[in-house]
């Protein structure tokens, strides 16, 4: 009997946060106010893109209380799926606000171990979600260069045309920090702003610092 094996899959986790509406109502007005007041504000690393960033400290800290537990649970669920030993970690992150012309170039989040994106204000019919590139790029490029490109939807070069990977407003996704990704400009010109929260997860102590993940 013949078999096909899809070896070395890339784990991407998605969950819709139940307290999304509350967090959006608190955070988006403040972020839009900052965006209009300081339209050129962006991170130092954002030199090859048309983007805008603000730090966690740019909004009232207690705004995070309504989603903090859900984010931590998602991180621990992702760690359990990966089979990671319990460890202490820190989260570092920032907000992104884009109008329909703005974009983020191809990048990854090394040296973090994995990263997250939370879609706070997002119109899936008009805005673009993050596009992930297939880590097996060498093989795919070889096939395309040999004029026999792969068309199997499980082996695409990126997730742009993956109809199974559709993001909704309120979704949080977690993915390996080494996974290359980009954010194109919006699918069409429109007046609403796209607002996301990006963060990295980095170990800060010995893997033996915690006996087990919380249940």
Regions found by a protein language model. Give the residues of each.
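Short conserved micro-motifs at the rims of enzyme active sites and ligand-binding pockets
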Residues: 26, 186, 208-211
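Short beta-strand His + acidic residue motifs that chelate non-heme Fe in jelly-roll/DSBH
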Residues: 104-107, 181-188
